């Protein structure tokens, strides 16, 4: 049975039991700031289990993509550890409970119509106090010797829903391990008894202060189950490990072909296959390889896989070449991979190239931090923390070079850093405790700023930091949109903050008392411009996704009065031509003059009308209602910000700048409406200043015979094209100026050589002193000196180049040490200088000391 058939059978079975089929959620969690990845089938459904949301369906089944990297070091060493895996699940939210859940599991696993496992191959664990579960399994015909009670079969992760669980194991026989069910009882790592399914009966409210038997029963009981697809495939396909199933083996075969090495269970093959799947699925879901959080996890996986490739002789980037076989292996169930295949490969190639550059410098950096063939714990930590060299790579270098490392000290320093991080988190917690007054303030305050810019209102609360109004037109700094500016009874509001329970805190200099009536008004002009920029941000995002791909996700934004800023992920630099096309398409949307519609919907209505949208907005925190901003269907998004009423209000859109702010993250700054020309002029000002300086320099170099052509700047287009034009124009002028400088230099050199007799003494000796007072570029003087030195086969040439405010001394020699001569002489002239034996330079601003220097040199050279 193929993995595709296993998934389909699971879904088909539970659909026949009236379960709603839930599509796999993104690997990037929603509403889980402290969770890097979706790591279990229940993770995206927790909102239903904790009562935060009421599900539309009480019975749910799914095949959920998951990532866990906690046991990364075990991947490849064991048969079943993976960083990416698929969890098959069935869930009941206040519907069926123990008996039905156990019956469903029994039927699906043992019925010839479904998986058809021999009953005698199944072993079941249950919580030692849970006699109901024991009896249900017994009634279904499970041998009581195959029923194992365990004290630890109880699921709880702190206060909240908890309950006993029952685990189902498949016995693969004595050939995998001669020991028997003690392997299960003692929880020993083995390849004989494979845990294939865990069913959690969520029936109690966990109270850490009480023993389990004292827990209160939940009014609504739930079922949460999870079965590992990879493990089921291993059993149903009768393979030795998960890695020989069709979920990994096509990749391993591709690696065999690439390396010309036969797979016999090598760890490197397994690690590469596992990590590559994780990378492909994570990137497909919008994750970015960075130096922080989940991005760092992915970068670590990529580098670990790349290192394993080197063990197989793959010295050049290779992971990107394995994307097509990965997609081919998984596309039957995950069709979206096909759309992003090329993008994923490009991301991996880019990151592999970056890693190669890191490796080239890493070993050199490693060697620089050694002391007597030893790497101290301090330097180990420095290489890891400051230079970003992976721990395993440092250890590999040490092993290869036979270097002793103070690994224990490194770990101590690492723990210190982690503890400091925890301490900082504690400080933040303490700070939050100090805001207890905010947390306990529950009086509602109405925001009327979507439609009103001013209102008469009343002060309902006075804090040390500011006041809360009964109703307010002020928008706080939220969702990337900056706060409003304005006044309360002619008092300038300095800061607007949203309190924990949703009210708006207004900070300013002044005194008000509770119950006092006031007049609040915002800066209407600035608010409108902010709203236009917010709508423009939505349009920009849509066009970016159209032009670059659906993998584009917002990584940060700032919607202000003077401009907007949008940060996004992408795997390569965007060309100027593409940026111009993006700008053009945003303007085309603006010129369509379509209304911006706002919908306030209940969660239930929003799920019916915009289900896909809600799934895409992984970080949205839904309450009773959601606000949808709909711009003629080409841009539909959840948004609490203020917007234009029609795209025509934006008038015009101009990109001001584009830059890379970190690996794989780019930033566009743009502007719309009447701000366009003013903002563009401000951006062009530095270029204009640079162009002016270039022009002035060129004019200063011009001679009677040589003239520099100053090209006219192209006409202003009120577009990013102006930025591009200026950049190109300056680059062209810079290149032309370099050539002109060379031409001017050659002109002066030629003229000076033609007039060399004007600078030479009447009699040419092997030791010569020259003084030049005619103003020339120093490069010309040096060229002339070198010309004279070799033309007349001199032993020593000392040249004084006298300028109004300084003197430059040059010495070229075949006999005495030029550097020593200059160094000793300029000290007498209150100057400085030096050089090597054959060439030296010095100088002084004390021009009156010229004679002292010349007399010193004459004596040294013995010139009369």
UniProtKB/Swiss-Prot annotation:
SMART domains, alphabetized: tRNA_SAD
Subcellular location field: Cytoplasm
EC primary class: ligase
Organism: Aster yellows witches'-broom phytoplasma (strain AYWB)
Signal is among the record's keywords: no
Protein name: Alanine--tRNA ligase
InterPro entries assigned: aa-tRNA-synth_II/BPL/LPL, Ala-tRNA-lgiase_IIc, Ala-tRNA-ligase_IIc_anticod-bd, Ala-tRNA-synth_IIc_core, Ala-tRNA-synth_IIc_N, Ala-tRNA_ligase, Ala_tRNA_ligase_euk/bac, DHHA1_dom
Database matches in Gene3D superfamilies: 2.40.30.130, 3.10.310.40, Bira Bifunctional Protein, Domain 2 (3.30.930.10), Threonyl-trna Synthetase, Chain A, domain 2 (3.30.980.10)
Protein family: Belongs to the class-II aminoacyl-tRNA synthetase family.
Domain statement: Consists of three domains; the N-terminal catalytic domain, the editing domain and the C-terminal C-Ala domain. The editing domain removes incorrectly charged amino acids, while the C-Ala domain, along with tRNA(Ala), serves as a bridge to cooperatively bring together the editing and aminoacylation centers thus stimulating deacylation of misacylated tRNAs.
Main location: cytoplasm
The encoding gene: alaS
GO biological process, one term: alanyl-tRNA aminoacylation
GO cellular component terms listed in the entry, alphabetical order: cytosol
EC number: 6.1.1.7
Binding of Zn(2+), residues: 534, 538, 639, 643
Required co-factors: Zn(2+)
Entry's Gene Ontology molecular function annotations: alanine-tRNA ligase activity; aminoacyl-tRNA deacylase activity; ATP binding; tRNA binding; zinc ion binding
Cofactor annotation remark: Binds 1 zinc ion per subunit.
Keywords, alphabetical: Aminoacyl-tRNA synthetase, ATP-binding, Cytoplasm, Ligase, Metal-binding, Nucleotide-binding, Protein biosynthesis, RNA-binding, tRNA-binding, Zinc
């Amino acid at each position: 049975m193929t993995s595709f058939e296993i998934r389909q059978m699971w879904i088909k079975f539970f659909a026949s039991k009236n379960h709603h089929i839930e599509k796999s959620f993104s690997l990037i969690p929603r509403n889980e700031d402290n969770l890097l990845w979706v790591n279990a089938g229940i993770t995206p459904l927790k909102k239903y289990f904790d009562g935060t949301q009421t599900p539309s369906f009480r019975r749910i089944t799914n095949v959920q993509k998951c990532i866990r990297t906690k046991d990364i070091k075990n991947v490849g060493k064991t048969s079943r550890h993976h960083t990416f895996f698929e969890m098959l699940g069935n869930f009941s939210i206040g519907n069926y409970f123990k008996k039905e859940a156990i019956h469903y599991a029994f039927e699906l696993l043992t019925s010839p119509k479904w998986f058809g496992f021999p009953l005698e191959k199944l072993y079941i664990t249950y919580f030692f106090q849970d006699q109901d579960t024991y009896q249900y399994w017994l009634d279904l015909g499970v041998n009581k010797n195959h029923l194992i009670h365990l004290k630890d079969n109880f699921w709880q992760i702190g206060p909240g829903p908890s309950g006993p669980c029952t685990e189902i194991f498949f016995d693969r026989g004595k050939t995998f391990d001669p020991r028997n069910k003690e392997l299960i009882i003692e929880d020993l790592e083995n390849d004989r008894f494979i845990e294939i399914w865990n069913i959690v009966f969520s029936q109690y409210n966990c109270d850490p202060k009480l023993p389990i038997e004292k827990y209160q029963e939940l009014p609504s009981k739930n079922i949460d189950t999870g079965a590992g697809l990879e493990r089921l495939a291993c059993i149903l396909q009768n393979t030795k490990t998960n890695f020989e199933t069709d979920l990994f083996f096509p990749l391993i075969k591709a690696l065999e072909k690439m390396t010309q090495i036969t797979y016999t269970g090598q760890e490197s093959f397994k690690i590469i296959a596992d990590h590559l799947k994780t990378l492909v699925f994570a990137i497909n879901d919008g994750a970015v390889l960075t130096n922080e959080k989940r991005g760092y996890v992915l970068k670590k996986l990529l580098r670990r896989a790349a290192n394993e490739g080197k063990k197989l002789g793959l010295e050049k980037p290779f992971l990107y070449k394995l994307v097509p076989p990965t997609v081919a292996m998984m596309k039957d169930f995950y069709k979206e991979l096909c759309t992003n295949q090329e993008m994923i490969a490009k991301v991996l190639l880019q990151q592999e190239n970056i890693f190669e550059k890191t490796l080239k410098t890493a070993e050199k950096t490693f060697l620089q931090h050694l002391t007597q063939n030893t790497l101290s714990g301090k330097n180990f930590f420095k290489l890891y923390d400051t230079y970003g060299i992976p721990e395993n790579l440092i250890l590999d270098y040490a092993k290869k070079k036979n270097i002793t490392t103070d690994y224990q000290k490194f770990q101590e320093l690492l723990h210190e850093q982690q503890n400091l991080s925890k301490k900082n988190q504690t400080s933040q917690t303490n700070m939050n405790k100090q805001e207890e007054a905010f947390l306990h303030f529950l009086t509602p305050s109405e925001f009327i700023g979507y439609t009103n810019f001013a209102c008469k209102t009343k002060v309902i609360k006075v804090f040390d930091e500011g006041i809360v109004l009964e109703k307010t037109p002020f928008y706080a700094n939220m969702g990337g949109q900056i706060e409003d500016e304005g006044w309360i009874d002619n008092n300038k509001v300095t800061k607007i903050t949203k309190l924990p329970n949703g009210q708006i805190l207004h900070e300013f200099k002044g005194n008000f008392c509770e119950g006092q009536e006031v007049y609040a008004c915002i800066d209407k002009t600035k608010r409108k411009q902010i709203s236009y920029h917010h709508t423009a941000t939505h349009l920009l995002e849509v066009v970016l996704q159209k032009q670059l791909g659906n993998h584009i996700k917002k990584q940060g934004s700032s919607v202000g009065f003077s401009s907007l800023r949008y940060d996004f992920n992408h795997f390569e630099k965007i060309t100027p031509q593409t940026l111009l096309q993006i700008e053009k398409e945003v303007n085309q949307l603006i010129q369509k003059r379509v209304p911006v519609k706002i919908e306030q919907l209940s969660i239930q209505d929003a799920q019916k009308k915009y289900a896909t949208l809600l799934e895409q907005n992984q970080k949205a925190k839904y309450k009773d209602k959601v606000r949808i901003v709909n711009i003629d269907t080409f841009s539909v998004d959840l948004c609490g910000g203020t917007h234009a009423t029609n795209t025509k209000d934006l008038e015009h859109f101009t990109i001001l700048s584009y830059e890379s702010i970190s690996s794989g993250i780019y930033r566009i700054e743009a502007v719309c409406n009447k701000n366009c020309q003013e903002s563009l002029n401000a951006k062009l000002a530095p270029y204009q200043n640079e162009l002016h300086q270039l022009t002035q320099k060129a004019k200063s170099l011009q001679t009677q015979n040589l003239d520099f052509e100053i090209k006219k700047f192209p006409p202003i287009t009120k577009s990013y094209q102006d930025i591009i034009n200026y950049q190109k124009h300056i680059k062209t002028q810079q290149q032309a100026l370099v050539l002109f400088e060379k031409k001017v230099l050659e002109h002066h050199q030629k003229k000076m050589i033609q007039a060399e007799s004007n600078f030479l003494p009447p009699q040419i000796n092997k030791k010569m002193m020259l003084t030049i007072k005619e103003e020339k570029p120093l490069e010309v003087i040096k060229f002339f000196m070198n010309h004279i030195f070799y033309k007349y086969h001199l032993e020593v040439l000392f040249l004084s180049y006298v300028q109004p405010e300084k003197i430059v001394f040059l010495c070229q020699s075949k006999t005495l040490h030029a550097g020593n001569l200059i160094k000793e002489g300029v000290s007498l002239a209150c100057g400085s200088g030096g050089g090597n034996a054959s060439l030296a330079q010095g100088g002084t601003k004390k021009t009156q000391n010229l004679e002292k220097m010349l007399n010193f040199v004459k004596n040294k050279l013995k010139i009369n």
